[in-house]
């Protein structure tokens, strides 16, 4: 972007579409939008500029991202509140600010541009770096520790479940054998090991490290477990008429998002009940049928949008246990 204050800031994915989906909920005075995955603040800057009456609560587990976003969003003054937390801490973050409910929540899931582009973070299999992969550098678990300490069965499970890797058993076995000779500390070492363990026919189908690196990143940061807690918390934080927008980038995330939104957009009335009681009515109304993908123009302008799956919903009724009800 031409007005970026940092050279490594990239175009936010589907910004205009996210704004369009959030707009009906953010028109009212005093509207609060939670950017649950703040990153470097690209989506937030666009939203705050478009809705001058809105207040932002930005959450991120990465202190580096918070620092960059804080500088980028400084021009919006006291309309911005940034919180260092993982996004399943949304309720606690809002309570700390004295906010009972919000008009919008945005999730832009997965690894951020900042984390991918900074080689020393170890997220990329295309550059040699320490095997770190922590989104929050203050946390303890690293990819190096996972490779050094996890039993073979756990490595196999992680590669299979989080990477959907067909060679999970083979890779886990080779890693355990290799670490007997010395620790695997760098991404280049791991890539070389995986390449040697991959049959040529399979290697031609794609980079052998892609799924393993995804699996390690998800394990280190507990991304799927956090998402499963964060989505219900986000829905519960929405005021009636508030909107939730979620961008996911791989099928494991999208399945969780799809399940949560579909479940809460259906009646919970028991089968055979002659009348649907108010407490059984759907809490959400889906705003998009299925998942929306980036069009060719978006992908050409912003290649990072290629794998995105966008889902959105509107809050239609409050939970029975909503505070203040």
UniProtKB/Swiss-Prot annotation:
Compartments reported by the entry: Cytoplasm
Q: Which domain of life is it from?
A: Bacteria
Q: Which InterPro entries match?
A: RsmH, SAM-dep_MeTrfase_MraW_recog, SAM-dependent_MTases_sf
Catalysed reaction(s) here are:
cytidine(1402) in 16S rRNA + S-adenosyl-L-methionine = N(4)-methylcytidine(1402) in 16S rRNA + S-adenosyl-L-homocysteine + H(+)
Biological process according to GO: rRNA base methylation
Q: What is its EC number?
A: 2.1.1.199
Which family is it part of? Belongs to the methyltransferase superfamily. RsmH family.
Q: Which UniProt keywords apply?
A: Cytoplasm, Methyltransferase, rRNA processing, S-adenosyl-L-methionine, Transferase
Its name, as the record gives it, is Ribosomal RNA small subunit methyltransferase H
Q: Name one GO cellular component term.
A: cytoplasm
Disordered as annotated region, ranges: 295-325
Q: Which residues cross the membrane?
A: none
Basic and acidic residues biased stretches: 311-325
Q: What does this protein do?
A: Specifically methylates the N4 position of cytidine in position 1402 (C1402) of 16S rRNA.
Which Pfam families does this one have?
Methyltransf_5
Any single GO molecular-function term of the entry would be:
rRNA (cytosine-N4-)-methyltransferase activity
Binding residues annotated for S-adenosyl-L-methionine, in chain numbering: 41-43, 60, 87, 108, 115
Native source species: Leifsonia xyli subsp. xyli (strain CTCB07)
């Amino acid at each position: 972007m031409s007005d970026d204050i940092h050279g490594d800031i990239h175009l936010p994915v589907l910004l205009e579409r996210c704004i369009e989906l959030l707009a009906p909920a953010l028109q009212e005075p005093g509207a609060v939008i939670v950017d649950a995955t703040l990153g470097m603040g690209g989506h937030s800057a666009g939203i705050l500029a478009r809705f001058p009456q809105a207040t932002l609560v930005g959450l991120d587990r990465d202190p580096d991202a918070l620092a960059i976003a804080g500088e980028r969003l400084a021009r919006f003054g006291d309309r911005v509140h940034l919180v260092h937390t993982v996004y399943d801490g949304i309720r606690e973050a809002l309570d700390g600010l004295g906010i009972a409910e919000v008009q919008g929540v945005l999730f832009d899931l997965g690894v951020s541009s900042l984390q991918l582009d900074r080689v020393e973070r170890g997220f990329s299999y295309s550059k040699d770096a320490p095997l770190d992969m922590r989104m929050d550098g203050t946390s303890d678990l690293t990819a190096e520790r996972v490779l050094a300490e996890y039993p073979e069965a756990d490595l196999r499970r992680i590669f299979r479940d989080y990477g959907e890797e067909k060679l999970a058993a083979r890779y886990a076995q080779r890693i355990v054998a290799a670490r007997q000779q010395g620790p695997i500390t760098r991404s280049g070492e791991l890539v070389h090991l995986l390449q040697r363990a991959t049959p040529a026919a399979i290697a031609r189908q794609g980079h052998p490290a892609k799924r393993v690196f995804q699996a390690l990143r998800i394990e280190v940061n507990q991304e799927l477990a956090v998402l499963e807690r964060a989505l219900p918390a986000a829905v519960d934080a929405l005021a009636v008429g508030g909107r939730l927008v979620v961008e996911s980038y791989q099928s494991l995330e999208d399945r969780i998002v799809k399940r949560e939104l579909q479940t809460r957009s259906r009646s919970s009335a028991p089968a055979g009940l002659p009348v649907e009681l108010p407490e059984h009515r759907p809490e959400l109304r889906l705003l998009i049928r299925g998942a929306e993908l980036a069009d060719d123009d978006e992908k050409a302008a912003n290649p990072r949008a290629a794998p995105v799956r966008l889902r959105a919903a509107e809050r239609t009724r409050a939970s029975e246990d909503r505070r203040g009800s």
